[in-house]
Structures are given as C-alpha cells and as structure tokens.
Amino acid sequence: MMFNNENYKDYDQELWEAIQAEEDRQEHNIELIASENMVSKAVMQAQGSVLTNKYAEGYPSKRYYGGTEYVDIVESLAIERAKKLFGAAYANVQPHSGSQANAAAYMALINAGDTVLGMDLAAGGHLTHGSPVNFSGKTYQFVGYTVDKETEKLDYAAILKQAKAVQPKLIVAGASAYSRKIDFEQFRFIADQVGAYLMVDMAHIAGLVAAGLHQNPVPYAHIVTSTTHKTLRGPRGGLLLTNDEAIARKMNAAIFPGLQGGPLEHVIAAKAVAFKEALDPAFTDYARAVIANTAAMAEVFAKDDRFRLISGGTDNHLFLVDVTKVIENGKLAQALLDEVNITLNKNAIPFETLSPFKTSGIRIGCAAITSRGMGVDESRTIAHLIIKTLVNHQQPEILEEVRYEVRRLTDAFPLYKKN
C-alpha cells in the first residue's frame, strides 16, 4: 500500500507542533551548551535522504546485504574525507555516537578488568572515561587523574608519576569540560614510559583540530575517537581514527559485529557533507572565530570579581565559571538563564564540593553562536547579559530587559534564514 501521508505536518500534528516549537526555541534562544552546534541545511538534507531506507551491515565492498553499491560510495566518501581532514591512515565512520566510539576503542585495545588511567569527571573528563555509573567504569578498572589544584590545568609530571604507580594498560586523554590545550605528545610520552596504549577522545575539539588550531592527536595516539557534531558542526554521531593497520582491523571489528549491526547510512552521508565543509578553507575562519568569541566572553567574567573563571582562561571553544558568589549553585543559574532564553548547563568544577546534581559552576561554549554569525562584540554582550541575570535574579523587571536583549540579538542573527 502506498503512503498517503507525504506531509507530516498534516498527518501528525502533535509531532509537527513539538518540532516546530523546538525550531522556534533554537531560533530565539542563545545556545551556549558547549557540546551543541548548528548544522548546515546541506547536512540536514543528507540526513533526511532515502538512505534511511537502506540496511548495510558490514563495510564498503564487504556487506552482508545486496543493493549496497550506492551506500558504498557514500560511506567511502565519508571515510576518505575523514582521513584527509585529520591526516589519518584509517577511519571508521559507523559509530552511532561518541560513547560507542569510545566503547569500540576500549574493546580494540584492552580487556575487561584492565586498568585504565582517565581524566576524572569533576576535573573535566567524560562519563565514558571511567565514571562508576557508566559502562566504562563498570567494565574496566579506571583510575582518575585530575588537574593541579592551584592552576586547574593538567600537570603532566603528576600524571606520569601516577601512571608509573598504577601501571595502566591504557591512558585516555581528552575532556568534556577542560578549557585549555592538551599536549598529546606529552601524553604519548607518558604512555610509552609505562607501556600503555594511548587513546585520545577529541570529541569537543575535533573542529579546532581539523582547522589546525589545536594539536592533532592522530600522530600520537594509538586510537582517536570523536563525535561528529560539537565543533565539527556535523550530525550527531561518532568517528574512529588510527594510523595502525592492526589496530584498525580491531576497531572495525569492535564496531561491527562487536557493538553495532547496520550502520546509519543517512547519518554517514551527513557526516560526509560535514567533513567536506570542514575541508573548506572557510571552516578555518569559523574555528578561529569560535576561539576569539570564547576568549572575549571569558574575559568579561575574568574581570568581574563576583565570578571565578576556572583555570583563569580558555584556549578553545568553552570555559567554566564558578557562580557561587552570586547564586547558590550552577543548577539554579542554569534554570534562571533558561527563563531569559539563554541556554547553557550546570557543570562541576575541579575539586567540586557540591552534588553533581547542583554543582558550583556553569559551562559556556561559543560554537553555536559563532555558527549564527555572532562575533566578539556579541559575545561580550552575552556575557554581560548572563551576569546581569545572575546578579539581579530576584528582580523580574531586569530579567524582562534581558529577554528583550536576547530576542534583539537572535533576530539580528537568524539561525536559518527563511526562503
């Protein structure tokens, strides 16, 4: 029977209204969640293509189904572009997410119960870097490294000392809430000193790496994992890279048949579009603007003694702010800013004293506002609006002023221009 529901707006009004409301929210909110970005219409078009109909277990030219000659072309394009973008010999574009990419990397390199040294969640790590509530912490024996208590930056000498003490089989470098550059060459040196593998999770900084604005981990790590959204500005998904042929075979087997069945070829097509966009010289300009906007916004907080900028600054697309001098915790700050249409997230800070459900800090990222075309002036304005909201959170008339200014900014920089 043929479909008679070509227009989902008419067929499923409930769903259409929810999606329309989300479109309006994105259009009229200032998005500062560091793990979010705004993709191009080309990325969305590829993801919404007929490729969603096709099952394709296996890899290009080695499928378990017929009729895959065209998805082979699509996936091969994505693979070759990813390799070129990051200077890698091998790439796997099938992971459905960064978490699954990390799981595959672990499966490829180590065994259940092995000791792993990874960044502590409170210091800026990710759930998949050994949190006890995550599969990583349940499957492997993770030991967390942290940052220096005074500088709030990575202390490579201390990490080396810790690595020698615990003798891990794997060291994980990379973070989800660390605002400074990470020296992957130093991490490889540490790994070699103890005979460990090095895995780098570059999910947050992949776009900056692609643009040549952060050290590329591929020459140093045994495996590099990433998401394809965040600063890379692609669809939500994962990526694996390596220069080692034997490890490439293991990581491919870990994804399929180890963790996943059929790949999402429509998402892989969208990844291919995003990789092509990132190979364009204009993407480097975008990444430079992200860093400049983040630095400009962070500087406003650094100059206000009512707030504390974690580590004193930022080198990438995000930074953390301790807000406890002006408001009880990060959870309340997040909720208040939601009320004025500024979206960010509460976040633990190094050596956190509050519950992870409350936190002392907030995390701010500038990738999404940069995608809208906002610059350093707008970034400073947004920082002042955040401060104005948190300092005057008990004054409704002030909050209304902030809402007006937020709407003025979003109207001036529309997300997707209407045809």
UniProtKB/Swiss-Prot annotation:
What the entry lists under InterPro entries is as follows:
PyrdxlP-dep_Trfase, PyrdxlP-dep_Trfase_major, PyrdxlP-dep_Trfase_small, Ser_HO-MeTrfase, Ser_HO-MeTrfase-like, Ser_HO-MeTrfase_PLP_BS, SHMT-like_dom
User: Where N6-(pyridoxal phosphate)lysine occurs, residue numbers?
Assistant: 230
* Cofactors: pyridoxal 5'-phosphate
Q: In which pathway does it act?
A: One-carbon metabolism; tetrahydrofolate interconversion; Amino-acid biosynthesis; glycine biosynthesis; glycine from L-serine: step 1/1
Localization, UniProt: Cytoplasm
Q: Which GO terms describe its cellular component?
A: cytosol
Highest taxon in the source lineage: Bacteria
Q: Residues at site: Plays an important role in substrate specificity?
A: 229
Q: Which reaction does it catalyse?
A: (6R)-5,10-methylene-5,6,7,8-tetrahydrofolate + glycine + H2O = (6S)-5,6,7,8-tetrahydrofolate + L-serine
Name the Gene Ontology molecular function terms of this record. glycine hydroxymethyltransferase activity; pyridoxal phosphate binding
Give the record's GO biological process terms.
glycine biosynthetic process from serine; tetrahydrofolate interconversion
- Write out the coiled-coil annotation as residue ranges: none
Family (UniProt): Belongs to the SHMT family.
Full protein name: Serine hydroxymethyltransferase
Organism of origin is: Streptococcus equi subsp. zooepidemicus (strain MGCS10565)
Per UniProt, what is the name of the gene that codes for the protein in this document? glyA
